[in-house]
């Protein structure tokens, strides 16, 4: 794109493109985007003359077309929801485990916002069989050339022009590819039971386009009904209310509008246990008892979340413990949170992950980032609320405050490593609001939107009146933007209006917080009493003449041990002999907690302990959680003596990984250059 095109789209991205929409008020009401005109005038009064920009529109539009560019509203989506928006999907799948494909039919109910002659959707490696109106009228369509990692633009020609407020129903028959990036097909030997195959999906951020033609952008939310045909012995679950399961057919309904990335499907031979009045846990038989015990407090977490955020609106809150190859700690699919089996620590010490996914029921699922440039609006808010809710479960107010601050300090540790070691403090991906033009959302995934975003909200809370005042703001914010998608400017405008008259707002350096790389400009004054014992022990470990015993850490909580290990990662490596002695005396080698195991393995790798290389490779081969796998592989890569062995191990296991894991690890191991 030319310099003028870049300048235009960067500085007035949404208002300029919306100037093409005749029926603006209708578009605003659908997409939840308001006051674009005011924003346009504010952003451009000292930049370009309005009429010069208007004349440049044709140039920008032509360049989009020539380049096969993605859409104006979302740099990661071909779709054009400012022209027509999907409101409801009727979906059916026939599952073929042998061919590893879904045979699908979708009926899209589309509301027209502009005068249009076609509808544009996202696809990725879909075999489109036919497209027709619901009355049977065949429609012509064209699949654009594939754009690597983004798929192909599907343009569906309408038999006649459609006008604003008109509704269309378009029926599409399609098959997914065996290589669909949203799906992982597991052979029986990759499951706990070793007898039956398994299928699960991961659509976030932009992989829903590989399992159905859709507007694969979080700016669009739709309700859905689904029907899935699978072998009789299999249980089918989705991100929706399960209605009926008769023989080999299961039906679902999701009456709350969701973005495409929250569409989810899992099929396996599963069992369930009741956790509470609105919750079950699902897993393979071999894991069900451990899972039920580990997540027994789910209802307690839900009730604590409701006290802070208001009523839970998704009816049921089930958990599905997936096979180890699942790449995340959890995924907040509505009605059915997906979780990794690495949470089954046997001590409920990783309950914060469940609280995190529960909080997404409000921040992310109800109130959603408009595109993934504003991902912090999902994850930063969720981490912020997660820590408040987890702390609220502690009866003593002082201990509650200390616990919240301690977990915030753990997050700050991880943020510092991400910014200073992994990405680099000058990396544009360390900004809270990133630019995803020519950057895939999977490449932008890091701790930054989680921890920098949460830290920003904590800073605002401390500045603007404390928890009681800020809790009221949060409830107001969640209520106002419920069922909508928004961007950072809209959040900022709402906060400024809510706290108008508060003189301390003038202290906020919005530009540094939102748009500058590196660590945050301000670090809140956290209570450090829970880290004092850890820091004292760290000083002892770093002393040249000292002895160690289990008594040193006997009173530590699992998270204090994690704090200690993270501190050891952040400093110069210890001598191998001292490290081995610590592992024995502190019984770290015996831990079943994966948060402890993975950090200990990293410490050993960084100290070049050859005896632990096999353990590290076995660990990354056994489970696929990227939080663990990526840092270990990066550390192995940095150790030149074992680099080739690490690469060979990855290549041998790549066929068994989910797409997002293999995709990011290839970059970590410099295999995609």
Residue ranges and their predicted role:
Residues 2-20, 28-32, 40, 47-315, ...:
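Acidic/His-enriched low-complexity segments
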Residues 126, 257, 343-344, 605:
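Hydrophobic pocket-lining residues within nucleotide cofactor-binding pockets
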Residues 252, 281-544:
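Hydrophobic alpha-helical and helix-loop surface patches within well-folded domains
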Residues 268, 387, 395, 571-572, ...:
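Short loop/turn hinge sites at secondary-structure boundaries
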Residues 446-453, 470, 478-487, 496-673:
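Long, ordered, helix-rich scaffold segments
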């Amino acid at each position: 794109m030319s310099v003028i095109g870049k300048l235009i789209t960067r500085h007035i991205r949404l208002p300029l493109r919306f100037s093409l929409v005749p029926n603006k008020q209708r578009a605003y009401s659908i997409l939840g985007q308001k006051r674009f005109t005011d924003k346009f005038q504010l952003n451009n009064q000292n930049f370009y003359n309005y009429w010069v920009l208007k004349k440049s529109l044709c140039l920008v539009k032509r360049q989009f077309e020539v380049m096969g560019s993605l859409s104006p509203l979302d740099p990661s989506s071909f779709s054009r929801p400012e022209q027509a928006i999907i409101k409801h999907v009727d979906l059916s799948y026939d599952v073929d485990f042998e061919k590893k494909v879904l045979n699908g039919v979708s009926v899209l109910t589309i509301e027209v916002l502009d005068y249009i002659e076609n509808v544009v959707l996202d696809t990725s490696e879909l075999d489109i069989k036919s497209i027709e109106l619901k009355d049977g009228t065949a429609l012509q369509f064209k699949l654009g050339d594939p754009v690597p990692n983004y798929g192909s633009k599907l343009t569906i020609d309408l038999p006649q022009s459609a006008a604003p407020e008109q509704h269309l129903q378009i029926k599409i028959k399609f098959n997914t590819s065996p290589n669909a990036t949203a799906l992982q097909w597991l052979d029986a030997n990759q499951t706990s039971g070793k007898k039956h195959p398994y299928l699960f999906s991961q659509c976030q951020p932009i992989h829903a386009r590989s399992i159905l033609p859709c507007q694969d952008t979080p700016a669009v939310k739709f309700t859905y009904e689904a029907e899935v045909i699978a072998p009789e012995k299999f249980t089918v679950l989705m991100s929706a209310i399960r209605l009926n399961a008769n023989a080999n057919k299961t039906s679902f309904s999701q009456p709350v509008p969701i973005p495409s990335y929250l569409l989810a499907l899992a099929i396996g031979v599963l069992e369930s246990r009741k956790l509470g009045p609105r919750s079950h846990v699902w897993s393979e038989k071999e894991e069900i008892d451990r899972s039920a015990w580990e997540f027994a407090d789910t209802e307690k977490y839900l009730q604590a979340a409701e006290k802070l955020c208001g009523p839970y609106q998704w009816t049921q809150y089930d958990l599905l413990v997936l096979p180890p190859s699942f790449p995340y700690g959890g995924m907040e699919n509505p009605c059915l949170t997906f979780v990794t089996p690495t949470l089954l620590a046997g001590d409920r010490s990783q309950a914060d992950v469940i609280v995190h996914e529960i909080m997404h029921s409000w921040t992310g699922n109800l109130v959603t980032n408009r595109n993934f440039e504003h991902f912090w609006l999902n994850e930063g808010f969720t981490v912020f609320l997660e820590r408040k809710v987890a702390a609220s479960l502690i009866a003593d107010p002082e201990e509650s405050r200390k616990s919240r601050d301690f977990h915030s300090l753990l997050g700050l540790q991880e943020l510092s490593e991400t910014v200073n070691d992994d990405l680099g403090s000058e990396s544009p991906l360390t900004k809270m609001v990133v630019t995803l033009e020519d950057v895939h959302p999977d490449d932008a995934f890091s701790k930054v939107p989680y921890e920098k975003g949460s830290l920003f909200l904590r800073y605002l809370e401390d500045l603007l009146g404390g928890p009681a005042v800020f809790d009221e703001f949060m409830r107001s914010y969640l209520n106002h933007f419920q069922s909508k998608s928004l961007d950072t400017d809209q959040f900022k405008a709402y906060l400024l209006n809510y706290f108008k008259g508060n003189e301390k707002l003038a202290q906020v350096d919005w530009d540094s917080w939102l748009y500058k790389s590196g660590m945050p400009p301000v670090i809140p004054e956290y209570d450090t009493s829970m880290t004092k014992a850890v820091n004292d022990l760290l000083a002892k470990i770093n002393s040249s003449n000292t002895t160690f015993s289990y008594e040193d850490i006997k009173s530590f909580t699992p998270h204090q041990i994690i704090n200690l290990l993270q501190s050891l990662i952040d400093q110069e490596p210890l001598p191998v002999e001292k490290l081995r002695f610590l592992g024995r005396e502190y019984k770290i080698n015996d831990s079943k907690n994966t948060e402890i195991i993975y950090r200990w393995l990293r410490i050993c790798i960084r100290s070049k302990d050859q005896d632990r290389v096999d353990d590290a490779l076995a660990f990354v081969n056994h489970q696929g959680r990227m939080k663990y796998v990526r840092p270990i592989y990066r550390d192995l890569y940095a150790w030149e003596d074992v680099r080739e062995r690490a690469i060979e191990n990855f290549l041998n296991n790549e066929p068994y990984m989910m797409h997002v894991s293999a995709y990011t690890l290839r970059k970590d191991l410099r295999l995609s250059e």
